[in-house]
Regions:
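C-terminal-of-GTPase-core extension/linker across diverse P-loop GTPases
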Residues: 1-119, 129-130
Length: 130
């Protein structure tokens, strides 16, 4: 059950800590909208990967089991056509190490080819040539 009133109150909160405190007071771990989205992704066999640059971070939706070139094609068809390789950081490694540079220095940035099956939460940079 999702309460529209509760979801509305959560949506109006700008501060992450305030939202978390509100959820705890309501006896919830996460909002109903988050649970709904997660359930829909699971039901539809979808997952998310990320791209990040100096000024932007984006989340992209793909099907579970998609390989790196297909993921690149979600961003732009030229990326899929001219796919060379992908640099990949696992989400948990990025959370623990905090920066791309720290992940690279710790050897946590992998270089993957056309057969790499993208994992949920991967942070990816694509190299391509068209």
């Amino acid at each position: 059950i999702i309460s529209a009133r509760t979801e509305s109150e959560i949506a109006e909160m700008d501060d992450y800590d305030d939202r978390q405190m509100f959820l705890e007071e309501m006896g919830l771990e996460e909002s109903g909208v988050v649970r709904l989205i997660q359930s829909a992704y699971h039901l539809l066999g979808l997952q998310t990967f990320f791209t990040a640059g100096s000024d932007e971070c984006r989340a992209w939706t793909i099907h579970k089991g998609d390989k790196a070139p297909r993921a690149a094609g979600v961003i732009h068809t030229d990326f899929e056509k001219g796919f060379i390789r992908a640099e990949v950081i696992k989400y948990d490694d990025f959370v623990n190490l905090k920066t791309e540079a720290a992940c690279r220095a710790a050897g946590k940035m992998g270089v993957e080819g056309k057969e790499y099956v993208v994992q949920d939460g991967d942070i990816m940079h694509f190299l391509f040539n068209v």
